[in-house]
A protein has these predicted regions:
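ATP-binding glycine-rich loop module of kinase domains
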Residues: 8-47
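Protein kinase-like catalytic core scaffold
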Residues: 32, 59, 73, 130-132
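Active-site ExK catalytic segment of metal-dependent nucleases
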Residues: 33-39, 76, 133-135
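Structural motif at the C-terminus of the N-lobe alphaC helix and the adjacent alphaC-beta4 loop
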Residues: 49-59
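Conserved structural core of kinase catalytic domains
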Residues: 61-99
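Protein kinase catalytic-loop region centered on the HRD/HxD motif
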Residues: 105-112
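C-lobe/activation-segment region of protein kinase-like
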Residues: 112, 125-194
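Catalytic-loop of the protein kinase fold
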Residues: 112-119
């Protein structure tokens, strides 16, 4: 018999345990991501951030429900690989991904919000880029996205260091000429950001 989790008289069937407190669940044929929190302030932070992100143009999974008594949130489950997995398979991402990430950064800067733009925090469903963590960070005046996080979206020294810190192996010989990479990044920024 499959494990079930009941929230506000709604029953969710556990399909897969994804982490210590995270589950892929199903209800009435729809797949969701369910997360249990240890502390009330963690859930409150999730609720606050989901509301802040909802008013931006940033794509996030739809929040289905949350329960403050059981310390649980339920959001739409986004299928597929995250952008880091796509990058590790192939150096060239769909141009729509670059267009989306630059637009997302512009919207966040305009709203005076900061998010973690690391590629493993995003999924691409073929049409749009979706931010998964529901986490915002303190806004930093003068923060340079292009010199920090955007470099993680290309085969650079920063990308190599980042993926190795996550426990992935990466062949440093795949890192291209830094001048050519910087030029590609600048052209993307001019095309989609300016």
């Amino acid at each position: 018999m499959k494990e079930t989790i009941n929230i506000k008289r709604k029953e969710f069937v556990v399909i897969e345990k994804m982490g210590e407190r995270s589950f892929k669940v199903e209800r009435k044929g729809k797949i969701f991501f369910l997360k249990k929190y240890d502390r009330r302030d963690e859930l409150e932070e999730f609720i606050k951030n989901s509301r802040r992100l909802k008013i931006t143009a940033l794509e996030t999974p739809k929040v289905y429900m949350f329960d403050k008594d059981q310390l649980i949130s339920v959001v739409d489950f986004i299928e597929g690989d995250n952008v880091l997995d796509l990058l590790l398979k192939d150096n060239s991402l769909d141009e729509l991904i670059y267009k989306s990430i630059l637009a997302d950064e512009w919207y966040m800067r305009r709203e005076k919000l900061k998010i973690d733009f690391a590629p493993n925090n995003f999924k691409f469903n073929g049409k749009k880029l979706i931010y998964l963590p529901f986490k915002t960070l303190p806004f930093e005046q003068g923060y340079n996205f292009a010199m920090k996080e955007f470099r993680l979206w290309f085969y650079t020294k920063e990308f190599s260091k980042y993926v190795k810190s996550l426990g992935y192996s990466f062949d440093d010989s795949k890192i291209g000429n830094e001048y050519a990479t910087n030029k590609q990044m600048a052209l993307m920024a001019v095309k989609y950001y300016m």
